[in-house]
């Protein structure tokens, strides 16, 4: 689990451990995340933009999940570097499956029109969204044996407090109908969707909405 210390990463680690998986939680500074070790994960330091680090940490694993983020670096540079290093490192480690936590602003509202393309889309969110868009292009253009999938939650703020319901919808590259409806989608249920796709893959080499 790369980016295990973030909001999505922490929930994914907890969900995977609860299901009986052995999980390696990769963060830049393990001392900041003792709760991950307390969950039962193997907490290690690593760098998702370094293919050698990825390969060494991923060896012996069946799958990888990336929920990495760096707010102190240009998003377009960081996400491209991470995508390239993850594909390279996981390929060398013979890890066949990678799930990536994307962003809902990449989903289409109509054919060829993404959320981030809409008039009035906030400038302060554009650079981060374009970073994820560049990441997706790296994945789509890669000649790789790694079977990747990018899951994009609704283009709204996810619920950090709500508990796990185990219920979600998934599929397609468009914003799910009523995705911003009465029941906010939670990080806990995003984690359920991620681990379900690790255990029972149903989508491959595409961007899909989840919510």
Role assignments for model-derived ranges:
Residues 1-21:
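N-terminal Rossmann NAD(P)H-binding glycine-rich loop of SDR-like oxidoreductase domains
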Residues 22-24, 30, 84-127, 141:
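Conserved Rossmann-fold NAD(P)-dependent oxidoreductase catalytic core, especially the SDR/UDP-sugar
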Residues 39-62:
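Conserved Rossmann-fold cofactor-binding substructure of NAD(P)-dependent oxidoreductases
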Residues 66, 70-99, 130-134, 138:
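NAD(P)-cofactor binding segment of oxidoreductase domains
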Residues 131, 183-195:
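Substrate-positioning beta->alpha
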Residues 137-159:
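Conserved beta-loop-beta element that borders a ligand/cofactor-binding pocket
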Residues 144-145, 158-166, 197-206:
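Glycine/proline-rich active-site loop of Rossmann-fold NAD(P)-dependent oxidoreductases
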Residues 168-185:
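A conserved pocket-lining segment of Rossmann-fold NAD(P)-dependent short-chain dehydrogenase/reductase
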């Amino acid at each position: 689990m790369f980016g295990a210390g973030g909001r999505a990463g922490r929930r994914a680690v907890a969900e995977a451990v609860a299901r009986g998986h052995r999980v390696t939680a990769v963060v830049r500074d393990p001392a900041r995340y003792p709760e991950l070790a307390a969950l039962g994960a193997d907490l290690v330091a690593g760098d998702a933009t370094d293919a050698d680090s990825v390969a060494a940490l991923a060896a012996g694993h069946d799958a990888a999940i990336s929920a990495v983020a760096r707010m102190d670096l240009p998003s377009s540079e960081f996400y491209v570097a991470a995508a390239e290093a993850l594909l390279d490192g996981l390929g060398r480690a013979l890890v066949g499956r990678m799930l990536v936590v994307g962003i809902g602003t990449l989903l289409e509202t109509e054919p060829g029109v993404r959320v981030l393309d809409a008039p009035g889309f906030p400038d302060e969110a554009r650079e981060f969204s374009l970073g994820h868009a560049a990441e997706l292009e790296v994945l789509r253009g890669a000649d790789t044996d790694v079977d990747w999938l990018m899951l994009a939650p609704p283009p709204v703020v996810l619920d950090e407090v709500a508990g796990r319901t185990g219920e979600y919808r998934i599929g397609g590259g468009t914003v799910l109908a009523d995705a911003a409806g009465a029941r906010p989608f939670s990080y806990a249920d995003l984690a359920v969707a991620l681990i379900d796709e690790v255990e029972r893959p149903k989508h491959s080499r595409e961007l899909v909405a989840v919510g």
